Amino acid sequence: MKQAPRPALALRPLAAGDEGELLRIHRAPEVVRWWDEPEEGFPWSDEPEATRLTIEVDGRVAGLIQFYEEPMPRYRHASIDLFLDPRLHGRGLGTEAVRRLVRHLIDDRGHHRITIDPSASNAAAIRVYEKAGFRRVGVMRRYEREIGGEGWRDGVLMELLAGEES
């Protein structure tokens, strides 16, 4: 039996036409529980220190991946984050998007360390990052506020060093 062809994944700069689909994906319960509720408009365009890319799968907007670069040259590290349309979860697309961005940050931008900090209770995201080569460094206790709540949740600090990419 033939295996279905793997979907074509691309990372590209955000475009104004991405707004509606990214907001729809971002508001999905599986996404918004880990990300702040978006305000009106296109909330990802007003943070100049972050670089955001649209994740496309088979030519369609499928999510967002972003990175923040440490501005001090002696550190040369970046942190990343992403969300993906829940309808595409479980297909390896998040892992592939992370791998591609990591390669770009190491090969093209000269970073030697990439970090990510998922919620400690977001087991699916942690698995994605581990498949991409990230290792757990430690738990950051009471790291971020619960979305829509008064409590705190722990975060997991994960890192990948140049040469460790999978």
Q: Over which residues does each language-model region extend?
A:
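Hydrophobic pocket/interface hotspot
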Residues: 22-23, 80
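Short hydrophobic/aromatic beta-strand or adjacent loop that forms the aromatic wall/cage
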Residues: 50, 153-157
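Conserved GNAT acetyl-CoA-binding A-motif
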Residues: 107-117
